[in-house]
């Protein structure tokens, strides 16, 4: 993309010029951080040319635009990724080397943008990358968090949350766009005005407080096609800059009130909502970015179109999970109150414009809001939801006369709560799950009543990942090898071509090269672990990796209990041949999620004991990688031997880490859950390690009972010993109460939930047996190399390019745009 016009000498001059203008220094005098800034601004200049060209092309072609609304966008670092998509990485690296500079070191100066946390945000980032690379018009819409979720520090084994001040040196790739600022209003009351002549009714919000939503545009560079789409993240600023008169009168609190309101809205991602103030802040955040994004989208539409009724032909809103689903009612408000449409007209437009992606079957994540909070904070939006609910209930009663149980299950407003997923399903024209199993569970279980009433809305879109970041950028050695073996670079935009690697699966030399690349990546990760954890790990050991958000259903607890079991085995039977293992964890726990934080502490306590026991001769190592994020994830995925995907079956909607490991040649050790099911289909059961209950078995136990963990505890001495070690002081320096809650969670029902809610003990023996099979397979070097290569060769389905094309074909109906430069 930048290639045809890339000139080393011109690039070097621009870097020197930027150093001078930005810092009043020469290249010899600046810090690495300053050099990173200088280089980034040169790259941004090149991007802006294509950004402008893209916008001009969009104005000319007038394509339909998808607005992808998400609370999170977990982008990862931009410099290297942008250079890869501009096909300029190699040239820039060489130019910098000629200046005595190292591109990788400069990349390390860039903080990960703190705009997301887990798979939800990373999926959104992959989707934006694919939309731009495939040539579709799209805006990402989110919040410009000042501190993100948090920076994780591990102190004495405990997680500590520190502010992630990612913007302290500015963000060279963003553009502030104050000319597109929008007012967003909260609270107050609604005055109804009647027009006697026309009979029209108007609703006016009064006595509200408001903030100014100011957009920052972040370029999303398509691969080698000159297309640059936009991620628009909103900052909050006070409407009135500073009330000096209040300050002069001594009313300091009032003087900074506006400032504080704006500041708190964009301070952090997912403020702790264990209390009322946290809930209120979360709802404010959601409405803030949704309202601003919709106002901007309507303004953009009206600039070129006169007929508001044709809005669905030019715009679609994809709501990524339940966080942005207030968009349904806000779009209605804008159409009714600002555009002056009648209810039926507004509803017709809204229900052809909004689409909803469901990401979870965990009830806790299907958002609900207390009506008293919602109606006070968003009074007009609440009125609109009341009317949507009233009409929907009438429809249910018409279709299912006398079935009040159905009404109770499907209502949007029920038991003093606003059910956001219900709102999205009722008003959306599409409802999709994110893996085939997940979508089936939604249709048969969680959303069954909705599916029976409106089956045409439901569809599946199995998630995917971008190979450009997770292979090209994260694992350049393997990327070059793939290109060499396929004889083409076309896999970069068509991952299905990876199946061409299957012809090398019996080629001894090719397998050797493949495993040699894996070893080099393990050496790189071992170096990272030594630098950041002070732990020596052997790259010849099996790197068994579980990196993902910490949640009980993801069962990091099962993993570490198994490590405790292995440690017992090695201690008791030192004569047994045991292939050395390194168990690698990376995970953040939500600040208010106490049990998840206990599991982190347990992992670190086990690491302390195991890693410092010289008697086991380094056969077992445990590493907890601090502050897991996109930039260290790339290093981890490239180095993994085993991909731990061990969620309780039926609980993981899809997962995308499983796909990143697969792409990088790590076989899956997992349950038949989420996208694991489809991974096994693609690679073959013989090239994965599957264990545990099926989703049907889990659901059956949950609905009908019949599982008592005490039976397993009493009958299996190995399991009993491991569980008892939680409370006998083995891993807590004699403190028998430190892990009492974890112990109790396995054996006794508490607080309305059953004992061993996530079937850890039920699946333990199956998991341990399957881990033995992993060791057996790994000992057979030839067999393992074939398995690893077949995983990479079978990953073609799991590109986000494929996922996005399915969204385009089935939901969005967009046209491709070509930018000529």
Predicted feature descriptions by range:
Residues 1-821:
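A conserved ligand/cofactor-binding region detector
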